[in-house]
């Protein structure tokens, strides 16, 4: 699907089911479509994948499209090994087949590579249907950090998974470059947005703690490299907002750190806005929505120079934060950043633009369905 097409003459060469797809879309106005998204990450999980899908779906609904997300909540599930808060679907194939065929989508997007993603991919390949995928999470690095499985094995599997589709969406240019080198094909840029009404500078001070206040927001787990933040020798106070499998252990190990547990909505925005620097220690995130949320609240960012921070901060890093190999040096440098510039930079990222980019990369389902 491509924005700006208003008649069949604008559509690339198509025939059969694909031509009928475009004819039906264009006959009823500005590209209304039935879009089915399959995701192993969905409510009640709280993470960047879920937040991205939730917001994009809301934007697509506002644009007049019919969108449904199929997540693990519809299936028998078991807890994920080493991370019981995440539930994985068990043998979802037949039930998922019925859901897909009942919904009769114009376009199929497979957001994750778990049991649901694998089942949806199998359904599409058996019927000769086209689909798109997305690379949200560095599972090879996550699995390696937890059980030591070599990342090259998992990337080989992921490459086969994604290359069977008609396009893999990636959040940043540096991730696109990396995945191209790893042999992934048909990569499509799909950036992210931020809720500028919720996440904004606030006058009230949230924290009654010694300044400066350095804050981390996110999952308290090994793959987030949170130890790199907790072990920093910094002045003032360190705050951790979020839950996760390492929360209890880290509380015991770092009694001087202020752990709040998870916060949402206005409370989360206040946590960002009341901080002097947002510290993002992750080495494996593919984007980092929390970076944008902090910037939208006027809070500068300190991070390693890796995919995600490198792309979001880009050439403005000196004004809105700092990135580099030394996280402590970056955190101290970020104290000098311009909070107004942080907000202005975040305003460049729109969820509507994110949804439009997603829409532009979808492909007609085609194939043969019962």
Residue spans of the language-model regions?
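Short alpha-helical donor nucleotide-sugar binding micro-motif in glycosyltransferases
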Residues: 100, 162, 262-263, 270-275, ...
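Donor nucleotide-sugar binding/catalytic pocket of nucleotide-sugar-dependent glycosyltransferases
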Residues: 156-202
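Conserved donor-binding/catalytic core segment of Leloir-type glycosyltransferases
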Residues: 206-241
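Nucleotide-activated donor-binding/catalytic signature segment of Leloir-type glycosyltransferases, i.e.
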Residues: 248-266
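Aromatic "clamp/platform" in nucleotide-sugar-dependent glycosyltransferases that forms part
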Residues: 283
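Short hydrophobic beta-strand element within catalytic cores of glycosyltransferases
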Residues: 300-303
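Conserved acidic donor-binding segment of nucleotide-sugar-dependent glycosyltransferases
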Residues: 314-325, 331-336
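A charged, aromatic-enriched C-terminal amphipathic alpha-helix characteristic of glycosyltransferases
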Residues: 336-364, 370
């Amino acid at each position: 699907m491509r924005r700006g097409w208003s008649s069949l003459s604008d559509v690339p060469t198509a025939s059969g089911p694909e031509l009928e797809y475009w004819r039906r879309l264009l006959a009823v106005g500005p590209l209304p479509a039935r879009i089915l998204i399959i995701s192993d990450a969905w409510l009640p999980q709280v993470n960047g994948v879920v937040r991205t899908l939730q917001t994009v779906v809301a934007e697509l609904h506002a644009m007049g499209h019919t969108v449904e997300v199929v997540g693990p909540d519809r299936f028998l599930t078991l807890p994920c090994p080493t991370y019981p808060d995440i539930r994985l679907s068990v043998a979802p194939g037949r039930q998922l087949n019925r859901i897909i065929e009942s919904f009769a989508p114009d376009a199929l997007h497979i957001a994750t590579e778990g049991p649901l993603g694998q089942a949806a991919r199998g359904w599409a390949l058996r019927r000769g249907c086209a689909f798109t995928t997305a690379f949200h999470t560095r599972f090879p690095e996550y699995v390696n950090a937890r059980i030591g499985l070599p990342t090259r094995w998992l990337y080989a599997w992921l490459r086969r998974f994604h290359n069977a589709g008609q396009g893999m969406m990636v959040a940043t240019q540096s991730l696109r470059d990396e995945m191209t080198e790893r042999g992934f094909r048909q990569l499509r840029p799909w950036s992210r947005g931020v809720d500028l009404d919720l996440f904004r500078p606030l006058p009230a001070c949230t924290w009654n703690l010694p300044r400066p206040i350095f804050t981390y927001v996110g999952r308290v787990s090994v793959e987030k490299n949170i130890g790199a933040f907790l072990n920093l020798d910094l002045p003032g106070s360190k705050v951790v907002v979020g839950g996760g499998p390492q929360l209890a252990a880290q509380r015991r190990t770092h009694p001087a750190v202020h752990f709040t547990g998870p916060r949402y909505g206005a409370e989360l925005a206040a946590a960002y806005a009341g901080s002097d620097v947002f510290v993002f220690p992750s080495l494996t995130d593919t984007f980092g929505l929390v970076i944008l949320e902090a910037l939208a609240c006027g809070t500068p960012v300190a991070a390693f120079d890796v995919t995600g921070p490198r792309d979001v901060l880009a050439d403005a890093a000196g004004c809105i934060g700092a990135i580099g190999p030394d996280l402590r040096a970056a955190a101290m440098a970020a104290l000098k950043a311009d909070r107004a510039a942080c907000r202005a930079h975040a305003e460049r990222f729109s969820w509507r633009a994110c949804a439009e980019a997603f829409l532009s990369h979808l492909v007609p389902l085609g194939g043969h369905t019962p």
